[in-house]
């Protein structure tokens, strides 16, 4: 097929971008294999298998009455709640259509052609995609034990570097950086380099392992802390995340964001979710038990895996394409990660106990051929 006539007129850096590959939807697999959607187990996208709290469901139902009206562009109530929870001024908070939005807003505000952004090998693939979209150059630093090599990343920072991305815990490998090492790295960076600390999986850490990253913003005005309601809070479908940063940085991001980037239902859901800390802690404990179940099962199968601090585990299965195809045929969805430079590995989300059992049974069959 001939390319559309307009394609040659798009910038080279746009045409060079590889599209983001999302986890396969349940409905898509059901269509492909003629399966009953209710029998499919999806462990591909690091979603909370419990879903949102009952209070969140009620808040969303109540907010439906506001559908004819535009959302509050400044999300007053949600920002106020986050301000109280995090002990920061509301002017330091930027809301996003998922935390992806925060990452992209940083690149929109601070990157242009000729600039560089630094990130680790095997880190979240949105970092290079968002960098490429601005015509900037991504500098991928080789991983160390599947995680961030902070010394090498610091050495990769040059006069052209405008942004550095760090994920803690890292996706898709699940590695974690101790707070002391993380702060030392942030403190070593030039103050004119924006460092984005992506904490999408922060709530899955044992509380004593969580970095006081929001407090660091006062010391490091070039720090942006990004978090999401998509994971532990169970709001993936509603797309709401937030960033905490110096007010001057927040002002720039608010200048380039869409005016209604977080919808009314998402704002209501996030506000209710934030108020239910017990539900999030219960989700963390369930995840810990599920992780132990998966790790034990992988050990029985003799599979190598990367110890994870998130709600997922990366397992080396050999011919990942063939194993994944077998899992799909059995109605189990996991995440191939060849596009992360890990062609022999699959990322498996921690599910409910019965979902984990289903995965391990299907994986056993897939490995036996």
Q: Residue ranges of each PLM-predicted region?
A:
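PLP-dependent aminotransferase-like
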Residues: 109-166
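Conserved PLP-binding catalytic core of the aspartate aminotransferase-like
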Residues: 288, 297-330, 346
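PLP-dependent enzyme catalytic core of the Aspartate aminotransferase-like
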Residues: 326-330, 335, 339-369
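Active-site pre-lysine segment of PLP-dependent enzymes
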Residues: 132, 150-160, 172-195, 199-232
């Amino acid at each position: 097929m001939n390319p559309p006539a307009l394609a040659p007129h798009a910038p080279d850096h746009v045409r060079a971008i590889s599209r983001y590959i999302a986890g396969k939807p349940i409905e898509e697999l059901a269509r492909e294999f003629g399966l009953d959607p209710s029998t499919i187990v999806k462990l591909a996208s690091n979603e909370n298998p419990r879903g949102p709290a009952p209070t969140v469901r009620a808040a969303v139902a109540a907010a439906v009455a506001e559908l004819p009206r535009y959302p509050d562009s400044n999300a007053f109530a949600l920002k106020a709640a986050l301000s109280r929870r995090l002990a920061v001024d509301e002017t330091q908070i930027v809301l996003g259509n998922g935390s992806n939005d925060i990452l992209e807003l940083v690149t929109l505000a601070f990157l242009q052609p000729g600039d560089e952004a630094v990130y680790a090998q095997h880190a979240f693939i949105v970092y290079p995609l968002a960098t490429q979209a601005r015509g900037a150059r991504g500098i991928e630093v080789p991983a160390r034990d599947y995680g961030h090599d902070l010394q090498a990343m610091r050495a990769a920072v040059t006069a052209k570097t405008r942004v550095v991305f760090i994920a803690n815990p890292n996706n898709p490998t699940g590695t974690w950086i101790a707070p002391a090492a993380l702060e030392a790295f942030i403190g070593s960076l030039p103050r004119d380099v924006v460092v984005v600390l992506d904490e999408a999986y922060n709530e899955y850490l044992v509380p004593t392992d969580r970095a006081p990253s929001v407090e660091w913003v006062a010391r490091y005005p070039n720090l942006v802390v990004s978090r999401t309601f998509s994971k532990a809070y169970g709001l993936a479908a509603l797309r709401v995340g937030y960033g905490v940063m110096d007010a001057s940085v927040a002002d720039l991001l608010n200048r380039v964001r869409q005016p209604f980037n977080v919808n009314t239902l998402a704002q209501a859901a996030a506000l209710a979710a934030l108020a239910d800390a017990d539900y999030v802690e219960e989700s963390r404990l369930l995840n810990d038990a599920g992780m132990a179940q998966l790790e034990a099962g992988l050990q029985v199968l003799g599979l190598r895996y990367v110890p994870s601090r998130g709600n997922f585990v990366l397992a080396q299965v050999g011919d990942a394409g063939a194993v994944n195809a077998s899992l799909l045929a059995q109605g189990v969805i996991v995440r191939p990660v060849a596009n992360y430079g890990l062609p022999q590995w699959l990322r498996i989300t921690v599910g409910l106990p019965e979902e984990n059992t289903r995965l391990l049974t299907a994986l056993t069959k897939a490995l036996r051929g």
